[in-house]
Amino acid sequence: MRKLLILFVLVLLPWLSVQSQKPIYQDAGQPVEIRVKDLLKRMTLHEKVLQLNQYTFGENDNPNNIGTEVKNLPAEIGSLIYLHTDPKLRNQIQRKAMEESRLGIPILFGFDVIHGLRTVYPISLAQACSFNPDLVTQACGMAAKESVLSGIDWTFSPMIDVARDPRWGRISECYGEDPCLVKEMGVAFV
């Protein structure tokens, strides 16, 4: 009986040792560069392509819009935009990514927080008209807190570009045509 127990332990120990080893990319004690290299080495081309995809929450009018359905969402996608009002759904989607994807890579949740989230502030062009970077810092600080509390990881802002052509559709997201003012307001935003 004793020999059988020793044999069982000898067979079981190597198996337990292998099972307890985490992949390098999951080891927070390793340098980031090494973790990234390890993760990229493990990823298939398909997984890498899906990490570059951003699906949209809301209308279900094209294949990259999930509507309000989670079941058809690939677990390996990189990010999802416009989901900030339902923490249960966000957690369900994140759990799907972590548990159903092969490598357990979490999804980034993004939203356009260019001039506030729950509290809406004047557009960037109007903020620049105030010539008050401190006020911009205060407003953006509140927007940042609201974003964190809403589970948003990625805010797509500020938009630091110099407005050159008034026909451009996103000119209102700029801080204007003066590079110095754009720089000051951009620094205040960040």
Residue ranges and their predicted role:
Residues 21-190:
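N-terminal beta-rich core of secreted/periplasmic extracellular enzymes
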Residues 1-23:
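Bacterial Sec-dependent N-terminal signal peptides
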